[in-house]
């Protein structure tokens, strides 16, 4: 760092920094453990499902730090942003500087809209970096001007958006209403005090006109207070402004009355000062209005003083002194009003940013929920949470490869396969093929919902679903048959529209299933059982265009459908081997009128179309796009779904249209305003009188927060000192030299304070001075010392001059006339100016916005005590002489008593103003703390979403959905010319699997399968297999692909990924052997590998699924199904590539491959034996840590949910609380009504023995 660059780092900046959350077990590779991925997501699902309580309105790498306290500007010191940092919510715009070194706008317009977020490495999907919050220049019309860090007022301190300005005015409406009431009450109490004193002390009765005016003005102020209080729910900002104008008019009229001799406070200069201070600091007037009002009041008083002089000792210097006095109060008032309003606007923006962060957090919650539900049905998540929520043993969440399986009886399983799809895929482009599949399966999903079926999975062109899961249904077989009939009608309509020979082959069987999720990667909900295998074989042994059912399904149909013999044994070896009787549903004689409603609409209009395309969705219905409801738009607030709108606090938007962006934020702010009106945060976190936080740690962080307007406050205090000097110079002491020395010293001392606090903005100053400046600005105690020193200097400037009054040469007390008094300009002739300048010193306390209000009160009391001591004892004669000279006998209250009353009024006004500012600043601080917590949670949620998205899509595909402009509404599809495809099955697992009491109806068999798949998944975590993507598991078959990354398609080593796939196949055989040793089994893998061109894409909107299609996929599958257990079979084309890469093969011969040999004849195949020589580029195996089964993930999140619940119960009435204390844990997590799980015969949560 250069010596000229001094960065002031606040000790409290960590409060505004998104703290890193070190991933457990991270080895530096950038991988994050998966066991906490579902924590907030499932909590959100649970809360959405069961919690309807009232919601309050109220990471890795080095983060960019920024402190921006209430009333502060963005000219803070920010350290350099590292390359791996995450932008905080409160940050400078890209075009803003940490320090302004010249006369510039406080909020300069940003030069660009780019983000400063660093790169997240090669695996970053691009949505972990928080969106940079808009800078203040995006909100303000004119944020003021600054020079060397000192902010100067502007008259147009308002927001650009009218809606935002309206919300801001409403946000602080209650505070301003209260300030006006307090000001009027204070004025009324002053009048009543004077009235009581007059009745008690005055020797003569009160002038009737004076009494009438007193009662009239008191009545006006009482009526104003009553109207403002009574109409508080209906009071608008404009109405409040007009009431403020009426209050000012009433006070100014009293000044006029005092000038005419009908006031209770002498000539009324002190009351003018109070009126000016109240106009700027307590009345709800815009700054422009306040300036006009202040100038009008000042001009009125000066005019009256000149035209109707009421003092015996009078001079032009005294008039000039008044002018300077009023100028000083107006200048201080402008600074106070502007900086106070600016502080409130900053607090409002922080509230808005907090609301925006909360809205983004809810959006992330909704994305998380959709991601979870795209993998797992809601009933499974809720049942798992319900069963695991009482598990308190911490070590259970770390147990190895847990599974969670449900068993359901009395269900029907439907398998459907598109006949002719392979030939169709060769005639369509990648985009057309994926679009067709998406539209076709979207219709099937819609039909499944109508017929009460649950879609399980899509396997290429195969679709299968289950009825009776999760809700039990007596007509589950009927639902599947109706589903099959609708599918056949749909595919026939497709065939008629596309002119392609496609049809459906459907098989249905009834029985029981086990359902759940296996493995560590690419989670997909699936079903397993003997009955699932039968349904699959019924499909493969069926007839295109017909529904092939078993005897079990026929028995469930109760004769409601006409059937005929299916002869499935003749077409399928499995059916023949197990002697399964089959039947075919007779196709009903129906026309297109019985098609699904949306297709009927299309068929009616299709005859009118002259140019029909290849798709079949030209009607009124169109399928949703995959992930359209999950990722939303990049860098914008995702629109809330109508279902998710109910999640907003207090169901804010139940009756509203779905909105997004600023409109939704503004709606939420309105709700926040309603909550804020109850002062919940103040009662819960802030002590009533001192306004200190009840939490000592919060108080410490708040006290260490940088005060960005401290320099401006100090400059304003220095200006006040200059005005005090000017006033007392116009009315000099008889001892001119001591006074000159006094003010010279005070000005130099104050100049030194200003210099030492602004030195950081002057690079020409010594480095040690600038570092001292940084330390002062960042240290609470040092700032307070400077503040007290400034107040003391101003106070000494106001009071010390009284020491130079010479009683020996004082003016004569008798026989003075107005004409002869013009020569007397000694300040001792006007002792009340000692009080007026003392009032200016008191106003100096109000200038320092961040000074604690209790400390202000203490300082003000000390000032009044010193003045009382001087006026009542040492210099009482000076005031008595002045009263004898200028006041008539009717004046019951002397100058010194009136002065103390005036100071008491200022004490109450300044203290209340300080309390309001401090409350605003502390409330702003609480909002920031809350926003920071929610942003950290949002960051963690986004990390969870990224990892979950990785479990659904390859990284480059995930980036497509997150970075691409989603307005184009294009499906994701990609053609690849050189990829490797592998299928690895366990042929012996079907014989091993059995549903008996001994193995818990097949659960123990699936437990072992889970261990096998999990071991396979862990192999993919090794660096050498980073080019391989798991696609899915199909029963006991494992499917993986290499070369899908666009980089691999363009690299020089075109088939390096294929070699990695072959190495992976060899590693799988070693892994299964290791499993056999520990499980006492003798499983063997049967693996098939092929390479070539494929089409990849994402289909399905509700359950998006990434898949690949093409001849290469079919050939790899046939290499597996026609292979030999314990061997790896490849076709000749793959053999020719791998043999040159150091692999050894054994020639098998020519085999018949269904679906391919019909056109190309028999296929030459080879068995992969291994590597002849090791690959020198293969690094030693290195496992990435932190992979756990789905059950371990959910178990961990449940225990975390319980811990969070305890924390939230502590804040049950807090704005940020979303869980009420009265709910019972069991009630919260137990499904209500006829929920799923009633049909589950047993669930498994135990571990592998």
UniProtKB/Swiss-Prot annotation:
Keywords: ATP-binding, cAMP biosynthesis, Cell membrane, Cell projection, Coated pit, Cytoplasmic vesicle, Glycoprotein, Lyase, Magnesium, Manganese, Membrane, Metal-binding, Methylation, Nucleotide-binding, Phosphoprotein, Repeat, Synapse, Transmembrane, Transmembrane helix
Record-listed Phosphoserine modification sites: 612, 622
Positions of the UniProt region annotated as Involved in CALM1 interaction: 1107-1249
GO biological process: activation of protein kinase A activity; adenylate cyclase-activating G protein-coupled receptor signaling pathway; cAMP biosynthetic process; cellular response to calcium ion; cellular response to forskolin; cellular response to glucagon stimulus; cellular response to glucose stimulus; cellular response to morphine
GO MF, one example: protein dimerization activity
Activity regulation field: At rest, the N- and C-terminal domains interact, as part of a larger autoinhibitory complex, with calmodulin pre-associated at the N-terminal domain. Upon a calcium rise, calmodulin becomes calcium-saturated and subsequently binds to the C-terminal domain. Fully calcium-saturated calmodulin then leaves the N-terminal domain, binding solely to the C-terminal domain, and the whole autoinhibitory complex dissociates, resulting in activation of adenylate cyclase.
Site residues (Essential for CALM1 interaction), renumbered to this chain: 1203, 1205
Record comment regarding domains: The protein contains two modules with six transmembrane helices each; both are required for catalytic activity. Isolated N-terminal or C-terminal guanylate cyclase domains have no catalytic activity, but when they are brought together, enzyme activity is restored. The active site is at the interface of the two domains. Both contribute substrate-binding residues, but the catalytic metal ions are bound exclusively via the N-terminal guanylate cyclase domain. The two transmembrane clusters are necessary and suficient for the plasma membrane targeting and oligomers assembly.
UniProt: ATP binding residues: 417-422, 459-461, 505, 1032, 1107-1109, 1114-1118, 1154
Protein name: Adenylate cyclase type 8
Tissue expression profile of the protein: Abundantly expressed within the olfactory bulb, thalamus, habenula, CA1 region of the hippocampus, and hypothalamus. Strongly expressed in pyramidal cells of CA1 and weakly in CA3 and the dentate gyrus. Strongly and homogeneously expressed in all cell layers of the anterior cingulate cortex (ACC). Widely expressed in the insular cortex. Weakly expressed in the spinal dorsal horn. Abundantly present in the CA1/CA2 region in the hippocampus neonatal and intensifies by adulthood. Weakly expressed in the cerebellum at postnatal day 7 and decreased further by postnatal day 14.
Residues covered by region (Involved in ORAI1, STIM1, PPP2CA and PPP2R1A interaction): 1-180
Disruption phenotype: Adcy8 knockout mice are fertile and seem normal. However mice reveal a tendency for both male and female to be somewhat smaller from day of life 45 and 30 respectively while food intake is normal. From there, females remain 10-15% smaller. In contrast, male transiently grew more slowly between day of life 45 and 92, after which point differences are not significant. Mice are less nervous.
Cytoplasmic side: 1-180, 340-713, 913-1249
Organism: Mus musculus
Region described as Involved in AKAP5 and PRKAR2A interaction: 1-107
Enzyme class: lyase
Mode of membrane association: Multi-pass membrane protein
């Amino acid at each position: 760092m250069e010596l000229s660059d001094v960065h002031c780092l606040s000790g409290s900046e960590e409060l505004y920094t998104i703290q890193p959350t070190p991933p457990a077990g991270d080895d530096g590779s950038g991988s994050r453990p998966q066991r906490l991925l579902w924590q907030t997501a499932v909590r959100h699902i649970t809360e959405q499902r069961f919690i309807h309580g009232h919601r309050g309105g109220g990471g890795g790498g080095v983060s960019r730090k920024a402190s921006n306290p209430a009333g502060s500007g963005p000219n803070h010191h920010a350290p350099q942003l590292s390359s791996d940092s995450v932008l905080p919510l409160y940050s400078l715009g890209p075009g803003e500087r940490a320090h302004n070194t010249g006369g510039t706008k406080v909020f300069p317009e940003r030069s660009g809209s780019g983000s400063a977020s660093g790169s997240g490495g090669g695996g970053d999907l691009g949505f972990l970096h928080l969106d940079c919050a808009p800078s203040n220049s995006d909100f303000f019309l004119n944020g003021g001007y600054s020079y060397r860090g000192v902010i100067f007022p502007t008259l147009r301190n308002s927001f650009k958006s009218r809606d935002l300005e309206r919300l801001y005015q409403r946000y602080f409406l209650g505070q301003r209403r209260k300030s006006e009431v307090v000001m009027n009450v204070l004025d009324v109490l002053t009048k009543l005090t004077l009235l009581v004193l007059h009745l008690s002390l005055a020797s003569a009765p009160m002038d009737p006109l004076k009494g009438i005016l007193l009662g009239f003005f008191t009545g006006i102020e009482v009526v104003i207070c009553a109207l403002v209080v009574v109409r508080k729910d209906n009071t608008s900002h404009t109405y409040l402004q007009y009431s403020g104008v009426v209050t000012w008019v009433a006070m100014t009229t009293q000044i006029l009355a005092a000038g005419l001799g009908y006031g209770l406070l002498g000539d009324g200069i002190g009351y003018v000062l109070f009126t000016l201070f109240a106009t700027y600091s307590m009345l709800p007037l815009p700054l422009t209005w306040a300036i006009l009002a202040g100038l009008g009041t000042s001009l009125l008083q000066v005019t009256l003083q000149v035209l109707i002089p009421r003092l015996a000792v009078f001079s032009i210097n005294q008039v000039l002194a008044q002018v300077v006095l009023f100028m000083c109060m107006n200048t201080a008032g402008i600074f106070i009003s502007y900086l106070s309003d600016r502080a409130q606007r900053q607090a409002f923006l922080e509230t808005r940013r907090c609301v925006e962060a909360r809205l983004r957090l809810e959006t992330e919650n909704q994305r998380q929920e959709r991601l979870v539900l795209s993998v797992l049905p809601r009933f499974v998540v809720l049942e798992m949470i319900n069963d695991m929520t009482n598990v308190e043993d911490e070590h259970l969440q770390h147990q190895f490869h847990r599974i969670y399986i449900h068993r359901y009886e009395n269900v029907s399983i439907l398998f459907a396969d598109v006949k002719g799809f392979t030939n169709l895929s060769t005639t369509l482009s990648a985009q057309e093929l994926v679009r067709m599949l998406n539209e076709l399966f979207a219709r099937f999903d819609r039909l499944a919902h109508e017929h009460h079926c649950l879609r399980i999975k899509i396997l290429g062109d195969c679709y299968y679903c289950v009825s009776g899961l999760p809700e039990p249904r007596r007509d589950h077989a009927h639902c599947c048959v109706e589903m099959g009939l609708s599918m056949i009608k749909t595919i026939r309509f497709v065939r008629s529209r596309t002119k392609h020979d496609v049809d459906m082959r459907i098989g249905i069987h009834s029985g029981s299933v086990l359902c759940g999720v296996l493995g560590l990667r690419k989670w997909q909900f699936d079903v397993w059982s003997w009955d699932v295998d039968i349904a699959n074989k019924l499909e493969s042994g069926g007839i295109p265009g017909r529904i092939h059912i078993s005897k079990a399904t026929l028995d469930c149909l109760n004769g409601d459908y006409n059937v005929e013999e299916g002869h499935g044994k003749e077409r399928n070896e499995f059916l023949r081997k197990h002697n399964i009787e089959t039947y075919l549903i007779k196709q009903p004689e129906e026309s297109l009128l019985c098609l699904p409603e949306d297709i009927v609409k299309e068929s009616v209009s299709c005859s009118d179309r002259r140019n029909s395309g290849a798709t079949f969705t030209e009607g009124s219905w169109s399928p949703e796009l995959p992930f359209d409801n999950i990722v939303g738009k990049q860098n914008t607030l995702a629109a809330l779904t109508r279902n998710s709108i109910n999640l907003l606090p207090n169901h804010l938007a139940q009756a509203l249209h779905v909105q997004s962006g600023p409109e939704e934020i503004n709606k939420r702010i309105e709700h926040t305003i309603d909550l804020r009106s109850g002062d919940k945060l103040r009662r819960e976190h802030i002590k009533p009188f001192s306004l200190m936080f009840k939490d000592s740690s919060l108080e410490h962080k708040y006290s260490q927060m940088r005060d960005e307007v401290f320099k401006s406050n100090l400059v304003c205090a220095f200006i006040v000192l200059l005005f005090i000097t000017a006033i007392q110079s116009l009315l000099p002491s008889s001892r001119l030299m001591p006074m000159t020395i006094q003010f010279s010293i005070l000005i130099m001392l104050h100049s030194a304070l200003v210099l030492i606090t602004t030195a950081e903005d002057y690079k020409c100053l010594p480095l040690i001075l600038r570092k001292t400046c940084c330390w002062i600005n960042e240290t609470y105690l040092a700032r307070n010392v400077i503040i007290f020193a400034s107040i003391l200097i101003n106070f000494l400037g106001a009071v010390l001059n009284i020491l130079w009054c010479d009683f020996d040469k004082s003016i004569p007390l008798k026989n003075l006339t107005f004409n002869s008094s013009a020569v007397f300009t000694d300040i001792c002739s006007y002792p009340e100016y000692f009080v007026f300048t003392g009032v200016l010193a008191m106003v100096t306390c109000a200038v320092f916005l961040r000074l604690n209000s209790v400390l202000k009160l203490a300082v003000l009391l000390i000032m009044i005590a010193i003045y009382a001591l001087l006026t009542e004892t040492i210099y009482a004669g000076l005031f008595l002489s002045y009263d004898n000279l200028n006041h008539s006998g009717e004046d019951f209250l002397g100058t010194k008593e009136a002065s103390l009353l005036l100071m008491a009024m200022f004490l109450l006004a300044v203290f209340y103003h300080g309390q309001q500012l401090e409350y605003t600043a502390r409330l702003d601080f609480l909002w920031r703390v809350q926003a920071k917590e929610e942003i950290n949670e949002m960051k963690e949620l986004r990390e969870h979403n990224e990892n979950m998205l990785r479990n659904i899509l390859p990284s480059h595909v995930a980036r497509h959905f997150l970075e691409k402009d989603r307005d184009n509404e294009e499906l994701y599809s990609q053609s690849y010319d050189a990829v490797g495809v592998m299928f690895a099955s366990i042929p012996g697992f079907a014989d091993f699997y059995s549903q008996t009491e001994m193995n818990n109806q097949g659960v123990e068999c699936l437990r072992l399968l889970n261990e096998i798949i999990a071991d396979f998944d862990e192999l993919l975590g090794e660096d050498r297999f980073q080019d391989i993507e798991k696609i899915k598991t199909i029963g006991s078959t494992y499917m993986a692909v290499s070369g899908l990354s666009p980089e691999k398609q363009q690299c020089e080593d075109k088939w390096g990924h294929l070699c990695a796939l072959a190495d992976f196949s060899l590693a799988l055989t070693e892994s299964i052997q290791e499993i056999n040793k520990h499980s006492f089994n003798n499983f063997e893998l049967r693996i098939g590998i092929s390479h070539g061109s494929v089409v990849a894409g994402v289909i399905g909107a509700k359950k998006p699924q990434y898949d690949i299609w093409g001849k290469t996929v079919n050939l790899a599958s046939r290499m597996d199904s026609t292979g030999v257990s314990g061997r790896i079979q490849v076709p000749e084309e793959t053999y020719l590539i791998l043999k040159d890469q150091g692999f050894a093969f054994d020639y098998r011969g020519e085999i018949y491959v269904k679906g391919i040999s019909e056109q190309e004849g028999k296929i030459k195949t080879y068995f992969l034996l291994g590597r002849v020589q090791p690959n020198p580029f293969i690094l030693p195996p290195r496992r990435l840590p932190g992979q756990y089964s789905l059950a371990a993930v959910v178990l961990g999140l449940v225990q975390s949910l319980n811990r969070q619940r305890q924390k939230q119960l502590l804040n049950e009435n807090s704005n940020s609380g979303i869980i009420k204390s009265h709910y019972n844990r069991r009630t919260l997590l137990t499904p209500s009504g006829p929920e799923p799980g009633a049909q589950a015969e047993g669930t498994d949560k135990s571990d592998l023995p």
